[in-house]
Amino acid sequence: MKKMRWTAMAMAAAMVLSSGAAIPAMAEEAVGGNEEVLTSEPHKIRTIITTDGEIDDQCSLVRYMLYANMFELEGLVSSSSKFHYTTKEGEVFKGKTENQKWIDAYAQVYENLCKHADGFPDPEYLTSINVEGNVTAPGEMGTDTPGSLLIKKCIMDEREDMLFLQVWGGANTIAAALRSIEEEYKGTDQWEEVYKKVCDKIVLWNDLDQDNTVNDYILPHWPDVKVIMSYDQFWAIGYPWSSTTPEVYHKYYDEEFMTKYIANDANSLSQIYYNNLTSMGGEGEHPIRFLSEGDTPNFFYILDNGLRSWENPSYGGWAGRFNKVNCADDAWNIGSEERDPMATSGQMLSGYWNEASDDGDRYKPIWRWADDFQNEFAARMKWCTEEYENANHEPVVQVEEGIDLTAKRGETVTLTAKTYDPDGDQVSVAFWQYGDADTYGGDVELTAGEGDQVSFTVPEDAKTGDTIHIIVEAQDDDEETPITRYQRVIVTVGAETEQ
């Protein structure tokens, strides 16, 4: 069931609902109702984007630029795929040059973006990390290139935090970096330490498996590297979105929405985005409808919007949700098609892979958030041209009791949300159980309390170690493009105390 948002002040405090429906809080005060001003700095994850320049990559790159303040980008690397490469007959593969067009468009709105949020990277810095990778053929990984060497340098530096490698095309430039590391260190007394360093540090998101390097090289040679295999779910925001997303959400992708909020001749990023929307139709006029952003889930996964999706692929968020493959500790997938065998940790993977579905729908883990991420896309697009006071900005939400809690069977858990909106908007709060992300297999009853508060009792049939995920949503009341922020509270069932 889709989460529901109801008018908070109309609800009775004693209302009880089960999993699947949202409990709205009884907020009675504007601007979140807090005397103190809450603040929230984004948790920025290090990342490198590799792209083959497909038109939907280009659309994703525009959206990425609007969120560039939320990440620590270390490289923008051109890479080939089985669809695009320099030696393909009839192909004009522009690579680094094409990426620079997007950086130049970003540069034109950079100063205005900085009026709305701190942390947007300088365009000159982006130009300095825009490099060519392995682009000559699908799966070519035998050559050291500026892109592969940049990736290798980031992997081998002294930092220990996660390095998230985004594969928008083929994984071959990343494979070339790993091949170079293996050639340099394997057979030396440093190899065991280097191998562990690499496997502990990097997480690789592989979109559509667009060359053979993950199957043929990365997993057999680096079986402990964490890999997220994304095959199907991203179609909820990809080319076939109209058939994978329920009709109720089509209004966030259709011509009216895109024309009103995205197409803006005064906005250089907007221009380059909607030019792609119309270019696919050939000659003549074409509707400005959403086209495809199949690679956007790459960075949605590490976007700090409060859903904590990067902590564990099974949690779910704007990027979708993933099941663990039993025979490979660190391979996560959402695909349902039969794949070639992959060697990992000495075992082979083949056949139908488990797909993470919400309510039995394999696309729902993304489309359930469509209104939220499309509204924020529209709001951030406005940041490119408007002054701060004429645009909408995200609210802040925190949970007073914390976001990682332990409770015993039969114990009552109370959650109190505190909110703030930088624009002075009213903020509505809703609570709901994300049952698909739980390891506890049942529903909990949520009871609305006073103010922005909800409570529930841990069921008696819950097992020690089971987790219950409660999503706390805070949405401002902007009339056109409301923005939503979240907190995910994970309640772990604790062991009973022996008498």
Task: Please annotate each region the language model reported.
Residues 482-489:
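Extracellular and select intracellular beta-sandwich modules with Ser/Thr-enriched
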Residues 19-30:
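Sec-dependent signal peptide cleavage junction
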Residues 1-10:
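Bacterial N-terminal signal peptides that target proteins for export
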Residues 11, 15-19:
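Hydrophobic core
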Residues 28-445, 453, 457, 461, ...:
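N-terminal acidic, glycine/proline-rich low-complexity segments
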Residues 475-482:
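Short, solvent-exposed loop/turn segments at the edges of extracellular beta-sandwich modules
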